[in-house]
Amino acid sequence: MNKKLTDYVIDLVEILNKQQKQVFWGIFDILSMVVSIIVSYILFYGLINPAPVDYIIYTSLAFLFYQLMIGFWGLNASISRYSKITDFMKIFFGVTASSILSYSICYAFLPLFSIRFIFLFILLSTFLILLPRITWQLIYSKRKKGSGDGEHRRTFLIGAGDGGALFMDSYQHPTSELELVGILDKDSKKKGQKLGGIPVLGSYDDLPELAKRHQIERVIVAIPSLDPSEYERILQMCNKLGVKCYKMPKVETVVQGLHQAGTGFQKIDITDLLGRQEIRLDESRLGAELTGKTILVTGAGGSIGSEICRQVSRFNPERIVLLGHGENSIYLVYHELIRKFQGIDYVPVIADIQDYDRLLQVFEQYKPAIVYHAAAHKHVPMMERNPKEAFKNNIRGTYNVAKAVDEAKVPKMVMISTDKAVNPPNVMGATKRVAELIVTGFNQRSQSTYCAVRFGNVLGSRGSVIPVFERQIAEGGPVTVTDFRMTRYFMTIPEASRLVIHAGAYAKDGEVFILDMGKPVKIYDLAKKMVLLSGHTESEIPIVEVGIRPGEKLYEELLVSTELVDNQVMDKIFVGKVNVMPLEAIDKKIEEFRTLSGDELKQAIIAFANQTTHVE
């Protein structure tokens, strides 16, 4: 396909990050002002210029004030495929106000300008600054429509409150794929009102009738606090109608400018139907913990490890060392991070935590302030079949990391544990319990600070049931559940990662931090919601019970009764009272495990882990 020059320009600017776009438009704007003052002078006075320095001063002042004003309005990185008429008006007022302010200052010291000259300068500057932005918007819109992506779909918006108003604020621009036909709201009394010129047609109870009448193809939910049962009801109605259902992006991402409410709509996901509200934690003390520091993450290519890297990057550390055994996953997260965040030195390191000498060499070379230990084998049935690998990675590997932290004098280590470490009947949980003992044991004798963070299942991680259910649904079913009674605690990947980072900030003396994760979720209910999300019914995608697998528990626990204490470091985060064992005793036990294999090793690790779970 032959590309035009405009296509290449659009592609080039689209790959720029926010700071680069600011520089791009800043350079263009100052050139526009320079050209404007030259043209204004030629038109007003002819070609003779008696005082060029004065005009340089005036242009510099005008540009400075203009940048301050559009920066205040958040337009200094404006690429106009998202611009609205109000943005163009702000640019006009910015040029006018900055020009008059500069004129007032210059007139007091350099009374060379007439007000008519300034008026001409304002008109030319505004024209030259707005012209490329408007042209950009028109070209981008034309390309979208020409590609076939710009086909407008007849759409209902659900929500006539604050969320709906935020959606409408950015809905009207040329790249929108929507033809917004009407708005529905839970409150039927709003019927007949208008929001952004679009009528409220009724309650979303009327969705089936109204969708057929208006030939609706898409529904977008713009109620941030919508109850999960209401989400399910809307989804069920949409599925019966054959209508696609989406949601508006999170309000905070819209306010921060990360998404456009009226265009960046998203698929409804399982977190919306589970109704678990993500815990928002106080980040005030994290700056001192992370900013300007070197941070090392083991297992940086995994679901949790990579998200820890993203979360830590928000606090502008000097360097993040991405340590992992899988070169492909480290490669992917490395390139994602350098694309998203600037000014941080990302160092990809391929290393195995079972290789102590390599770990120590990396730790001594980069001298991290904190090590987040996310590397582990986490799949319960796989570890039941491979107990030796679980021992080598989860126990020996954690020991190596903790020992290297001590030897390299790293100030702090945060280890990720699991609720499966509580009364573990399986190898994976037992090895993570022993890993907790290793961390608390090193904390007793080392100058470094160690802690562990214990939480439940993570939605969407590579080891969770979500990808399995998605694959089974895509294949036409059935969806397999081991036991319809089975329950698990769930949290999102970002939430789990935030907990890990906060635990590091509060760690003082070998604590095991435990999150209050709310109510457990039935895996059977989770499967039903996944089928609903796919647009199918249980008659189309059956859910079958296949029996519990080796090492699985019906119900997970976050802590045993003897571990529960009232010590709450912050909302929803507790410190568990856990048993501590001298490191010498742990060393002896690890040497014993090294000589065992197969079922003998499995039973020995599980027995030892359960002996040490209860506080004496």
Residue positions per predicted region:
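Signature of alpha-helical transmembrane segments in polytopic membrane proteins
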Residues: 1-150, 240, 247, 371
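Flexible, Lys/Arg-rich cytosolic regulatory linkers and terminal tails that connect or flank
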Residues: 2-7, 231-294, 406
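Strand-loop microenvironment adjacent to phosphate/nucleotide-handling motifs in alpha/beta enzyme folds
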Residues: 21, 280, 285-289, 441-457, ...
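A solvent-exposed beta-alpha-beta segment
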Residues: 45-49, 139-255, 328-332, 339, ...
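Proline-aspartate-enriched helix->loop->beta-strand connector
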Residues: 211, 215-217, 317-318, 363, ...
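Conserved Rossmann-fold NAD(P)-dependent oxidoreductase catalytic core, especially the SDR/UDP-sugar
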Residues: 241, 256-257, 373, 377-436, ...
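N-terminal Rossmann/SDR dinucleotide-binding element
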Residues: 258-271, 275-367
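Hydrophobic/aromatic anchor residues within beta-strands of the central parallel beta-sheet
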Residues: 348, 390, 450-453
